[in-house]
Amino acid sequence: MPEGALRNFTINFGPQHPAAHGVLRLVLELDGEIVERVDPHIGLLHRGTEKLIEAKTYLQAIPYFDRLDYVAPMNQEHAFCLAAEKLLDIAVPRRAQLIRVLYCEIGRILSHLLNVTTQAMDVGALTPPLWGFEEREKLMMFYERASGSRMHAAYFRVGGVHQDLPPKLVDDIEAWCVAFPQVIDDLDRLLTGNRIFKQRNVDIGVVTLAQAWEWGFSGVMVRGSGAAWDLRKSQPYECYAELEFDIPIGKNGDCYDRYCIRMEEMRQSVRIMQQCIAKLRAPDGGGPVAVQDNKIFPPRRGEMKRSMESLIHHFKLYTEGFRVPAGEVYVAVEAPKGEFGVFLVSDGSNKPYKCKIRAPGFAHLQAMDFISRGHLLADVSAILGSLDIVFGEVDR
């Protein structure tokens, strides 16, 4: 056969592919079954979030962040609130910090549970997602009992959180923390030593540490390659500095290492949650759940019924919003997917002049080409599963 008669085969992976994790379209160039090139086509879920935020007050902007990484919504709200608080130069009360950290760790478990179990489903294991969704249902109930919503919570506020947690809710979260490690152990037994699962993940999608830094990776993708880089330890925010937890790291940088890290991070998140609950119950864990400045946070209902000034403050906050001093700030949090950053520019008005969102999944998806090269077609879904990509934040 003449050389010119051989040509590579180009196929579409997605946008409706069950392993495509949302609306991803990959154009794959195949030589037989070997992947030669991967071309991700994004933008199918683009909603112009950054532009829409410019026309909203700081309070109205918060719900947009729930819709980015919609698997762990409160972690994104956290970054935006921290950025606005830095520009306003206000200190968040300790109880509000503890509640925020508690719910951010619930978000981390929500995200990792979904990722680990769907990664297993992508390579053929059907039981883990059923167990994972059962636990996620319980966690979403905790979201609902705190904020009134299962997914798009809009619970964080600039200066604190919307409302305090009822004591019964704190008790139920504590009881869940006691029972949940058993579920992780069950998943562990099902997957970690499983021969088929290991064959599909070990030495697949290897990323060296140098490559991870070059491509702007963060979170599990960097820790899987051997760097103990976690913003909760390296640049502690809120009350993470006083909490004890370990940072698991991998040594091979493959899909299996990333899976193992997510499993261990869920255990560490439970540890953090238990410490937060203990601190919430301690004598110094009481107090307000938001700043007591009525120019930023609305007064309580009881005050509004007694005081005309409180009523005026409430009306002005919900119609016009508060003004943020002019300036710019970049704040990043350790979201479940990696470093989620918000670059906030204020012109001194009641609306953000610019809000640039740094989504970790965006950097991870652009590396899909170099990670997948030389692998088989069947490995593409395993690699995609281990990158942990959610399209809300990639397309924004």
Curated annotation (Swiss-Prot):
Class of the enzyme per the UniProt entry, highest EC level: translocase
Xref: SUPFAM superfamilies: HydB/Nqo4-like (SSF56762)
Reaction(s) this enzyme catalyzes, per UniProt: a quinone + NADH + 5 H(+)(in) = a quinol + NAD(+) + 4 H(+)(out)
Coarse class of the protein's main subcellular location: membrane
Keywords for this protein: Cell inner membrane, Cell membrane, Membrane, NAD, Quinone, Translocase, Transport, Ubiquinone
Recorded superkingdom: Bacteria
An example Gene Ontology CC term for this record: plasma membrane
Subcellular location: Cell inner membrane
UniProt EC number: 7.1.1.-
Topology in the lipid bilayer: Peripheral membrane protein
GO molecular function: NAD binding; NADH:ubiquinone reductase (non-electrogenic) activity; quinone binding
Family: Belongs to the complex I 49 kDa subunit family.
Subunit structure: NDH-1 is composed of 14 different subunits. Subunits NuoB, C, D, E, F, and G constitute the peripheral sector of the complex.
Function of the protein: NDH-1 shuttles electrons from NADH, via FMN and iron-sulfur (Fe-S) centers, to quinones in the respiratory chain. The immediate electron acceptor for the enzyme in this species is believed to be ubiquinone. Couples the redox reaction to proton translocation (for every two electrons transferred, four hydrogen ions are translocated across the cytoplasmic membrane), and thus conserves the redox energy in a proton gradient.
Protein name, entry field: NADH-quinone oxidoreductase subunit D
